[in-house]
């Protein structure tokens, strides 16, 4: 899930239990954000796991790590290559069709005139950041945001881990209110700000660079009554405490980026900080959660 991958390692796994084990190990090892881990279940029940690295990984070390956590079965399928990040993202965006999600539709510039007029359009320009709407986690967040907006108008919104800015732009377009967006990754900060302007909500979406809640802007802008955070399970668990401190009573939180088997641990971490789960969407092996702060 890193925005500017150039080196790739991929392998397949036959059992869900082994896939769970190896994804847990890899997301733990790469918590610092120097690699992005993605896992997809194929229709035949096999799992494809892909890692993207900004710097070339030590192949022998990585092979040992995945074989130790997933077993010898993956050894023959493990392959390393490099991808031209910009061309790869551009090419994949050009192939993509608009993605409807509730009242929203996410599309590229080539589809500007072809999307349904009754939807809130979010145009995402080809860029080195995550979040075109096609991934199950982004779609899950948009669907839960749509659900929240049916019964309330949050007044203070945070999109933590904004990537292309897709969720912040969706919230700003629907609410016509200021949204704070943050990302650990400088290119994503630039891309999200550009996409905010492209979608004519640049005056509402303020994008900052921050790791988790480590910036004074959060205390100044908070407490938030809606937080969207589509990052991995491990960072989400670590962020439970600081997030709870930045929430208004009754605030809603939308979490995504976790594989479905990781949801119970994430729910437990947030429940311990006074957040109760309201909804659980499962899309393509990924979970998106809606929680509410009690009191
Ligand atoms: C899966 S992408 C989500 C992008 C977009 N919000 C979406 O829903 O499609 C996760 C984003 O979170 C950022 N990120 C990861 N860990 C973070 C952290 N601890 N603090 C802030 N941003 C983080 C990554 O750089 C990446 O842009």
Curated annotation (Swiss-Prot):
Q: Which residues bind S-adenosyl-L-methionine?
A: 138, 161, 183, 230
Q: Does Methyltransferase count among this protein's keywords?
A: yes
A Pfam family annotated for this chain is: PrmA
Biological process per Gene Ontology, one example term:
methylation
Kindly list the GO CC terms recorded for this protein: cytoplasm
Q: Which Gene3D superfamilies match?
A: Vaccinia Virus protein VP39
Q: Which SUPFAM superfamilies match?
A: S-adenosyl-L-methionine-dependent methyltransferases (SSF53335)
List keywords of the entry alphabetically: Cytoplasm, Methyltransferase, S-adenosyl-L-methionine, Transferase
- Output the InterPro entries linked to this UniProt entry: Ribosomal_L11_MeTrfase_PrmA, Ribosomal_PrmA_MeTrfase, SAM-dependent_MTases_sf
Reaction it catalyzes: L-lysyl-[protein] + 3 S-adenosyl-L-methionine = N(6),N(6),N(6)-trimethyl-L-lysyl-[protein] + 3 S-adenosyl-L-homocysteine + 3 H(+)
Question: PANTHER family from the entry?
Answer: ELECTRON TRANSFER FLAVOPROTEIN BETA SUBUNIT LYSINE METHYLTRANSFERASE (PTHR43648:SF1)
What NCBIfam families does UniProt report for this protein, alphabetically?
Answer: PRK00517.2-1
Write out the similarity annotation. Answer: Belongs to the methyltransferase superfamily. PrmA family.
Q: What does this protein do?
A: Methylates ribosomal protein L11.
According to UniProt, the name of this protein is Ribosomal protein L11 methyltransferase
Organism source for this protein? Bradyrhizobium diazoefficiens (strain JCM 10833 / BCRC 13528 / IAM 13628 / NBRC 14792 / USDA 110)
Q: What is the lineage of its organism?
A: Bacteria, Pseudomonadati, Pseudomonadota, Alphaproteobacteria, Hyphomicrobiales
């Amino acid at each position: 899930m890193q925005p500017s991958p150039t080196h790739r390692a991929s392998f397949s796994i036959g059992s869900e239990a082994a896939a769970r084990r190896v994804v847990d190990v890899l997301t733990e090892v790469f918590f610092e954000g120097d690699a992005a881990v993605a896992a997809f279940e194929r229709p035949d029940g096999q799992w494809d796991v892909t890692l993207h690295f900004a710097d070339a990984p030590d192949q022998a070390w990585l092979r040992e790590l995945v074989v130790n956590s997933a077993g010898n079965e993956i050894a023959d399928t493990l392959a390393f290559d490099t991808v031209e990040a910009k061309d790869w993202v551009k090419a994949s965006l050009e192939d993509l069709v608009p993605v409807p999600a509730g009242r929203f539709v996410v599309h590229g510039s080539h589809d500007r005139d072809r999307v349904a007029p009754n939807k809130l359009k979010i145009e995402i320009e080809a860029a080195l950041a995550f979040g075109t709407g096609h991934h199950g986690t982004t779609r899950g967040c948009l669907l839960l945001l749509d659900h929240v907006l049916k019964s309330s108008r949050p007044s203070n919104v945070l999109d933590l881990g904004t990537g292309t800015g897709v969720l912040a732009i969706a919230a700003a377009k629907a609410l016509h209110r200021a949204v704070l967006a943050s990302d650990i990754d400088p290119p994503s900060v630039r891309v999200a700000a550009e996409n905010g302007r492209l979608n004519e909500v640049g005056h509402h979406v303020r994008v900052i660079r921050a790791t988790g809640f480590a910036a004074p802007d959060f205390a100044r802008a908070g407490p938030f009554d809606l937080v969207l955070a589509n990052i991995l399970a491990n960072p989400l668990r670590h962020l439970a405490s600081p997030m709870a401190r930045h929430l208004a009573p009754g605030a809603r939180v939308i979490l995504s980026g976790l594989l479905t088997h990781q949801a119970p641990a994430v729910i437990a971490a947030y429940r311990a900080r006074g957040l109760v789960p309201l909804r659980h969407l499962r899309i393509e092996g990924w979970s998106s959660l809606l929680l509410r702060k009690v009191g």
